[in-house]
Amino acid sequence: MESVPDLQNTMYAAVDGYPCVRLLNLSGSIGCSNPGRDKVVAPIVRFENVDKLAEPSAILVISDDSSIASKVGGVLVEPRIDLQNNLKGFSPDQKFPQAQFAPYYNTSYEWNPIGSGIMWKSYGFPVFLLTESGSKTLQEFVAKNEDKKKAYTSKVAEFDLVMQTVKSGTHDSESCLKEATCLPLGGYSVWSSLPPINISSLQQPKPILLTVASMDSASFFRDKSLGADSPISGLIALLAAVDALSYVDGLGDLSKQLVFAVFTGEAWGYLGSRRFLEELDMHSDAVRGLNHTLIETVIEIGSVGKGLSQGVKNFFAHTEGDSSATNQTLVALKRAQESLPSENIKIASASASNPGIPPSSLMTFLEKNPSISGLVLEDFDSAFVNKFYHSHLDDLCELVHAVGIIFFFLLDLSFYMINAANVNSSAVVAAASLIARTLYMLASEIEDVQDSTLASINVNASLVKQLMGCLLDCDPGLSCELVKKYISPMSSCPSHYVGVILDEPSSTPFTGYINDVPRFIWNFLSDRTSIPRENNISGCQQGCKGRDEVCIKAEADGKGVCVLSTTRYVPAYSTRLKFESGVWNVLPPNSSDKMGVADPIWTESNWNSIGIRVYTVQNASYDRLVLLGGITLTIFAYLAIATARAILSKAMKRD
């Protein structure tokens, strides 16, 4: 050892994990945090019996005993691949996610029957999901601790999950925003038109066919939110459909304008779609070229990754709104299915017994305009088939891959086994093909589009597999060639948590404030929907000259390319928030805006650092024993000295 850092590395071992963090709304908080201003230090034990816990401990637990909660110092959730029991799934969300925003009254309906709702509760102790390497480190410490039960040392875990809102005593969104101890959940959505919209044209603007998908998911653990089936399979299908349509000639001659939007923040009160409509009302630069009165039909691509069953790709059309336009969409969807005979696709209308459309961005548009025509394409009918909705387990897993999760939630242990991949690429390809051909038929307004024309609209299956590898896995993850063609990712492992909005919202935000995924989507859509500029050799270091031009691939090669594209970022944050003089202010609710009244206004607590480390400490009982021994020894020494002095004094007097 040559330095203090070397000594620290010898004494302490960092443990990798994904934290559950503190989120706040207008009425309180959810999520996890250290209970006070200090780090939590607790011995690591593998729980067997609550009566054996004599002090707050960091536990590796297999239990359903809620009485343990009062003795918990912290929770370590251990991923396992060796437990293969009968499983029913796991979803920490509600049985009707975001029911308060539904455009109908039956909010007791269970779209997500397996939902436990645990992610919407507040916990006064830290909780971490360990990575595989973190689990290995911790298991070694646990094994050593159990092997040395008679030793006077123990292994402890130190949780650094101190939230600024807990330290400052700001326990709701309004107070923490005033004290600057939190930031609003949000980010940037992306929209693009195909072909680009000529804003300076004097011609009558075309009706708009708006196709939407979501790019954000949620889970109990902040940075483990892949959302493979829900909703990223729909996002991938949308990107693949845009790619397929970009090769079709004559799109500018169609009767309707194709517009695509990818929203973020939908898992937290439909932040992206609500702000998108708000920006349309304000005619802001972020939506320049669009007019909400021209939006004729909204088609949403929801969860489509689990549509494959026994070789058949099954999808369900959930519809709402104007019957004639909706019927046209259903007819086009059916025709698209018939044009793909070799794909073995089945389309069915959702059950009439459903209370309405499932949780989706379309709810926002219906609240704004109840007469708008809308359709949501899903891989389920009356209830989610994704058994891991808004769970860290909704990932891209291999076929016949078993997963056992030791997860206690005051305290609920669930084991899960996945018998098939969460997302099937052929199902995503089928959904993308249906959407691409349906959009072409609706935009052309030709009753009998030639089969040869539809046959020319083909989805690139290799692109779908690429996107799945890039957006749903860490290997290659965002380090894949497709993503690196456009941006320089900050991390290779994708996470689809919405994050927080860091500065004043803008239609031209600083790219450092935008997450990797929306930056990639913006570049991808700009590229696929663009018209290249002639003689574009010099790049765009000095900016693009044309008003409707954008610079793509600048992060990747430092030069970039100017292209003509109507692709924009749109801020995504609560419509009840306003940024003024560097401060976020909460606006009073508008009684005419049902969704605004229901908006919880989600914020995320600030923190200085988050982490876990483990190390060895000497037991307090041993310290007390040493102290007692020292005191006893001192007393005996004193008595011995006093006795010796007395004896010596008597002896000297006799002399």
Regions found by a protein language model. Give the residues of each.
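Secretory-pathway/membrane protein signature
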Residues: 1-655
